[in-house]
């Protein structure tokens, strides 16, 4: 390679922790996070945005578990990223896949977000300065590491996709601490 571009900050705290650590090299340069999602001025809605991603069958199990737990709290839920029909109710609105401008609007207007801890999603959260309940896909070691790192470094709430519970949601929904926008 003639050039290595690293989508992270050179200085700490890095978004990717040890994953972007490199030995000094003239070829490597830190270019900051990459995100299609930008902060926009929009009224904040009290709703839980669930962004589904990852392989099946984990994706469908994740959707089912989150909806079952969150509905118990009486919180409006919007689900994106699911191709299969989801149970609709007064509180659940399933949108399927969203384009980037739709997702940008939803992420900016939602008071709460639940998502996987993939690096692209984390860069989007950093770009808009939003906290989320991070639930790594089991067996995806990068996601597991990043969820743990963001929990420790940026005080993000995390949960395990096999053990997500109403208690996790209540703790997250009551978390009023801020996350500084980083771009």
Q: PLM features: residue spans?
A:
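Short glycine-/small-residue-rich Rossmann-like dinucleotide-binding loops
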Residues: 9, 53, 118
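Leloir-type glycosyltransferase catalytic cores
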Residues: 155-183
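Acidic, glycine-centered active-site loop in nucleotide-sugar glycosyltransferases
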Residues: 129, 146-156
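Residues in the short beta-alpha loop(s) of Rossmann-like NAD(P)-binding domains
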Residues: 10, 81-83, 138
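Active-site-proximal region of nucleotide-activated glycan assembly enzymes
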Residues: 1-30
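Hydrophobic/aromatic beta-strand patches that form the interior of the parallel beta-sheet core
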Residues: 3-5, 29-31, 78, 93-95, ...
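A donor-sugar binding/catalytic signature common to diverse glycosyltransferases
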Residues: 102-145
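Donor-nucleotide binding loops and adjacent catalytic segments primarily
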Residues: 32-112, 162
């Amino acid at each position: 390679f003639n050039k290595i571009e690293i989508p992270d900050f050179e200085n700490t705290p890095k978004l990717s922790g040890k994953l972007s650590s490199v030995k000094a090299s003239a070829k490597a340069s830190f270019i900051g996070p990459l995100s299609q999602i930008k902060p926009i001025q929009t009224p904040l809605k009290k709703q839980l945005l669930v962004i589904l991603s990852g392989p099946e069958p984990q994706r469908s199990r994740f959707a089912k578990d989150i909806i079952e737990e969150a509905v118990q709290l009486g919180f409006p839920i919007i689900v994106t990223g699911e191709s299969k029909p989801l149970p609709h109710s007064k509180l659940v609105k399933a949108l399927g896949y969203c384009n980037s401008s739709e997702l940008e609007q939803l992420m900016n207007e939602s008071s709460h977000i639940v998502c996987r801890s993939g690096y692209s999603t984390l860069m989007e959260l950093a770009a808009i300065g939003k906290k989320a309940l991070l639930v790594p896909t089991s067996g995806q070691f990068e996601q597991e590491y990043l969820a743990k790192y963001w929990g420790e470094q940026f005080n993000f709430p995390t949960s395990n996709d096999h053990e997500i519970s109403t208690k996790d949601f209540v703790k997250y929904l009551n978390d009023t601490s801020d996350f500084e926008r980083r771009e």
